Amino acid sequence: MVLPFTLQQLRIFKAIASEKSFTQAAEILFVSQPSLSKQIKTLENRLGILLLNRTGNKILLTEAGVVFLQYSERILALCEESCRALNDLKDGERGNLKVGASQTIGAYLMPRVLTLFAQSYPQINLHIDIDSTRIIAKKVADRSLDIAVVGGDIPTGLKKNLEIEDFVEDELILIISKSHPFAKKKKKKISKEDLYHLNFITLNSNSTIHKFINNILIQNNIQTAQFNVIMELNSIEAIKTAVSLGLGAAFVSSSAIEKELELKTVEIITIENIRITRTLSIITNPDSHRSKAFDFFYNELWLLKNL
């Protein structure tokens, strides 16, 4: 059977779907726009169906385009995986590994893991992708990533395609500035009622951590809707700076404030009878080829957990 498409046409189609632009896709793939347009036209003619709707400057996938994109991504991922599997046989302890992490983990936990791993296996090239838990999980499911560590809820629709393992516990703690009156409280502990007297600096209300903290507090009969939220920021670094300047209080991951605690720019306070923790997970695709590089990294993660 002669296939009605080539791998290059799949790469072109995937790039256009991702960039929503012929011009940008051509730049990424280092081909001319006329050549790219010709390849797509040939692809659609051979398939006998329209994949893209071109309306002015907008490019949208047709229903057929959405279906074809899913298969294109899987085919390309399998091609890359087959090359990695063969290279793994040739190269022994050399190789490449694509690692994903959700945002807080990628910014604060993963750099330490990667540094230690690079010291043990300098010959393995790591490619790191940091994004939301949902996007990272999708990339592991479609084999764009080999392994990932995430902290948020994994979409139900993806779970059947993933192997999910509990990794470590991450505590979400309340921080204030050293000059805050609550910092002088005995044992640095406050009551639930004290929370309503704080000015809060939070992550965007759509963020996974924000929703998780909110749910835990509500389960403990705390009315978060009555909190005085003075600022919403999309950066944990910005939140920590704002807290250290005395602008308010914030919940952050314990892994994110090691530097601030060492410099003594913030203070941790606990809430009576409440401890907020979440479980970080290692996610993999059970159907993917597991290279030696994968095994080394996977084993290193568990060794680091037990240190």
Curated annotation (Swiss-Prot):
Cystine bridges: none
Superkingdom to which the source organism belongs: Eukaryota
Biological process terms in GO annotation: regulation of DNA-templated transcription
Keyword DNA-binding: yes
InterPro entries documented for this protein: LysR_subst-bd, Tscrpt_reg_HTH_LysR, WH-like_DNA-bd_sf, WH_DNA-bd_sf
Cellular localization per UniProt: Plastid, Chloroplast
DNA-binding region, residue intervals: 22-41
Keywords for the protein's UniProt record, in alphabetical order: Chloroplast, DNA-binding, Plastid, Transcription, Transcription regulation
Cited Pfam families: HTH_1, LysR_substrate
Role noted for this protein: Trans-acting transcriptional regulator of RuBisCO genes (rbcL and rbcS) expression.
Family: Belongs to the LysR transcriptional regulatory family.
The protein's name: Probable RuBisCO transcriptional regulator
Species per Swiss-Prot/TrEMBL record: Thalassiosira pseudonana
Recorded name of the encoding gene: rbcR-A
